Amino acid sequence: MANILVVTEHLKGEFQDITFEMLGKAKEIAQSTGGSCSAMVFGSMSGQTDQMGAADTVITAEVGDDYNPEAYAAAVKSVVSANSPDLIMIGSTSMGIDIANPVSTALDIPTVSFCADIVAAGGGFTCTSQMYGGKMNVVSSVDGALISMVLAGSFNADTG
C-alpha cells in the first residue's frame, strides 16, 4: 500500500501544471497499491482545494501568500513527520529544489531527481530519471520512503 503526498506548486494564484501531473500519477500509484493520495496546498491556495480532485485528502499549510523557501520546507517537514507518506512527490523545479533537499536531509529520506516515471515495486519504488537533457535514462530503485522530484511534462496533467 503506497500512501502518497503531492506537494503542490502555484504561481500568481494559479496551480501549475506540474501539480496536476503529479496528482494524476500519484492517484494511479495509490489505486494500484490500495493506498491514498494527499495534496499539500499552501497559503491562500487553500481556498482552491476544489481543484485537487485526484486527491483523497487535502492538507493545508498556512505559510502566507508570498513564497518563502524556509517556511514551505518547514511545513512539508511537519506534514511528512505527522503523516509518514511512502512517497513524497515534489516538482523538479526551482521551488522543488528549495523544498526537497532540506526535507530529505532533515528526515533522512532519499531523493531521486528528474523523475520521468515512477512505479511501485515491492516495498518501495522504481524511478526512471532523465539525465543530460534527456540523452540518458537512469533507473533507480529505493526500498521504503522516497522523495521523488518529478520532471515537468512527464505525466498527463488532465488526469490530476
How does the language model describe each region?
Residues 1-160:
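N-terminal glycine-rich FAD/FM-binding segment characteristic of electron-transfer flavoproteins
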